[in-house]
Amino acid sequence: MTTASAASERAVRQRLVRVARGLEAGDLLVRGAQVVQPATGEVFGADVLVAEGRVAALVGPGLGVRAARTVEARGAYLAPGFLDAHIHIESSLLTPARFAAAVLPRGTTAVVAEPHETVNVMGLSGLRWMLEAGKGSGLRVFGSVPSSVPASPFECGGAVLDAAEVAEALRLPGVLGLAEMMNYPGVLNLERGAWEVLDAGYGGRIDGHAAGVAGRDLQAYAAAGPHSDHEATTPEEARERLRAGLWLMVREGSAARNLEALLPVLRERPRRAMLVSDDVSVDELLSLGHLDRLLRACVAGGLHPADAVALVTCNPAEYWGLHDLGLVAPGYHADFVLLRDLERFEVLDTFVGGVEAQAGSETPPLPGGGVNLGPSWATATFEVPASWPVMQVRPDQITTGVGAPGSGDARLVVADRYGRGEHAACWTSGTGLTGGALAISLLHDAHHVAVLGGSNADVRAAGRALEAMGGGVVVVAGGEVRSNLPLPYAGLMSDLPPQEAAARLSEVTAAARVLGCTLPYPVTTLSFLGLSVIPALKLTPRGLLDVGAWQLLPRETVRVGAEG
């Protein structure tokens, strides 16, 4: 801290002292609240006095406290603002300001964004853009530095973030640590590149990502330095991570829903646990909610409300070293939410820095990041090796199963979006798609184009439609576009108001339903079918990857997919 900033901090703190002692009037008084204190598990009546954007004091009702402005809580519950400790804002399909407009009314006041989607497309400039866009969003947007760009040696996106750039990014204001270390095979096999990135992160927080890792391998992974994991899907996996000293991030998003399965562990009141959404789409944010919906599920599942609130407030704040967030207590930032009850968690109002929260209205430009499938796309056919197994797609999960060759019902094509002209195809089962094509430009993590479709003509038409839009989501049938959602920010995000973006996405989903698709969230599920660090089979432009064996399957004798 510089001398000037220390002097400024001292001035703020000294005013808080004067206001707390009643020597000066505060800026805001929230009178007649029931304060939720997750640090002690209590709920108690108090008036909350705010000055300089921070809590000055919690005082007993009726003590004649002075403030420039008073908000009557009338017995409403006052909880700390909710903090999502691990989220990819891009998965909402919204820019940070539009994302804020969707989640501030749900009580979310801060997020730790992991922008490896934008960084895979744009490089380090994508991280800088996310932090800058976050400043004007109305939310407190912190960042973590992507550790795996590309996610594995089998992916090739728009950028490579080496250890030197990771170290540079870790010094950026607003960055809290190293993001999910997804390349766990590289960690376990002592690969130089993975360990150079770990070297850059030592001394700070290192997020983990260890899907399916167990036993001695999990012990080894934890010994390498990661501090957390959000990939547990069973109580046994969750307890094993806690016993290994890892913080447990319980994930509940649009593609992976693990909260119900892990509730038995949360009822055991583990000290080092939190709730995260990871990836959640705009339509789900508006219809179901954000962290508020996870709190509803926790309380319905038997947790005490204060214990549930701790999972989205003081616990994630402690994990990330945000010492002035996560509690309604003297000296803490006055980020809090007024709730009608502690069962439905209906939000009455949200405050950030002691004022009613408002989302920003402007997004900085993000040039580049379009879609270029290359000249060969115009005549491409999408052949599948006869020996390749079928990728079994699972609703509400980002893992896939393995089916016998020849048992699939819809073809998946993944094509390089950066002009290299590479593509591959495999058969899938479980999507229900019987014709036409659903295409996206947001295939994790390199964000290539993924097309789930029938005829070669529809697959090609869907890809060309994405090129024309600069990226997005599109449904094609009979060579014609039936519905689309352009995502002009890096081919990942829209700056439409959340309600409008959600309506367009719902139209896309409805159009996919007409083609037979049965996936509850087809765009989100499709977006994970290329993530090369999640078992069991994933498709890249270079071929079908057996994640467990950590190798691309050989391209042998081919059989042509649907003609046309």
UniProtKB/Swiss-Prot annotation:
Report keywords, A-Z: Hydrolase, Manganese
Protein known as: Adenine deaminase
Give the source species.
Deinococcus geothermalis (strain DSM 11300 / CIP 105573 / AG-3a)
The UniProt entry's sequence similarity note says: Belongs to the metallo-dependent hydrolases superfamily. Adenine deaminase family.
Biological processes annotated in GO = adenine catabolic process
Please write the reaction equations for the catalytic activity of this protein: adenine + H2O + H(+) = hypoxanthine + NH4(+)
Q: What's one Pfam family here? A: Amidohydro_1
Identify the Gene3D superfamilies for this entry: Metal-dependent hydrolases, Urease, subunit C, domain 1
Organism taxonomic ancestry: Bacteria, Thermotogati, Deinococcota, Deinococci, Deinococcales
Cofactor(s) needed, names only, are: Mn(2+)
A GO MF annotation of the entry reads: adenine deaminase activity
Q: Which Enzyme Commission numbers does its entry carry?
A: 3.5.4.2
